[in-house]
Amino acid sequence: VVANAPADRIRHPEKPMAGVNPARWLDAMQTADPYPIRAFITCNNPLSAWPHQDRVREAFKSLDLLVHIELFANETSAYADYVLPAATGVEKGEISRASEDRRVVWIDKVIEPPGQAKADGWIWIELGKRFGFDDVLQDKYKDSALFWDEMCINDPWMKGCTQKRLHSVPWRWVRVPVTDEDAPEIETLHLEGTTALGSPEGHRFPTKSGKLEFWSPAQEAKFQALGFSALPEFYTDREQLIDLPYAVRTADGTAVRSPFAKTPADTVTSRIVQPDANSPARALKARGFDMQLITGRPAAPHFHSWTHYAWQAQEMWPDLYVQIHPAKAAALGIEDGREVTVETDHGQIRARAWLHAGIRLDTVFIPIGWDRAQPFHPWPSVNHLTDETQRDPLSDHANLKGYMCRVSARSP
């Protein structure tokens, strides 16, 4: 969606975005760097999903205003000044999640939202009207189908993905790109002899040469601006049990404009270093952090934190667990199903041990999605163990996946 407010009423920020990754916003909330964030409107569950949960809580407490838009109350709701109940897809009409095979799927509205629940679009339009944009954010756009046709598909890839076309088939989906309502769907892109959408005739790929470009001077310049090369160089996160190269910020910590961010945003220059006697991982190992923590999506019944409000999923998988190899558990005096303590250099949590022979002896796995405000089986988020400062220098994404840890038996 492209902003279409009158030109004389569009504010152009004097400073770049506080950061691509929400972890960077914590600095803006707490220290006004690069500028202050005093009010925050959010959905989902940052108080489960963001790294370094102890700091996230302090940052949210420092805000003057926190508004939470969500289907179910969760731990973020508990910190909010205002909670706005949201409507589901079948209560408003919406596009479903993007599919890996480029299918755009429309979900029809079939029932009215319960109680005071409102569609996200309704909330933002009403807020915009109160800021004086009622001539742009018109009431007609509360109809999500009309908003989709008039505002959301104004580009060549999506132009033919209209409500008329979506509803011309019982399954309500179209595989993009489709340049108009009658354009045939393309099952496989970039086949030999085809022309990429928007490219000169005969250009199989949407590049200057029409070929796959693994390196170019323009790419190299972007990577070098951050201290890297466009040619692949292996590095990983710094907390690894084995010695591997990792990226560190340059000593002066100079902020530079990211050449990869779509919206202007600052990042820092970095360099790849080889492990040595002073590397962080060796220091952690010397302190007894002798296992590798891996995080990720939980077992089949759950998806993030959404399903923790369904009693059927709770019956199948109620508790936060830590998978650990039976031999390692025996050495630590840990029994299957008993509570244990998992600790990293950034925090500690408790979880229920799941002895599993399919995991490495030196590795444990803890899923995401739990929080202390869930109605049936509250547990702490695994992100009490993660660190918001460990971010990839190119994407600015935080490391949520791998940390060195130690596990100990916990008395019942």
Task: Give short role names for the model-derived ranges.
Residues 120-173, 179-182, 244, 254-255, ...:
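Long, contiguous, secondary-structure-rich segments that constitute the structural scaffold
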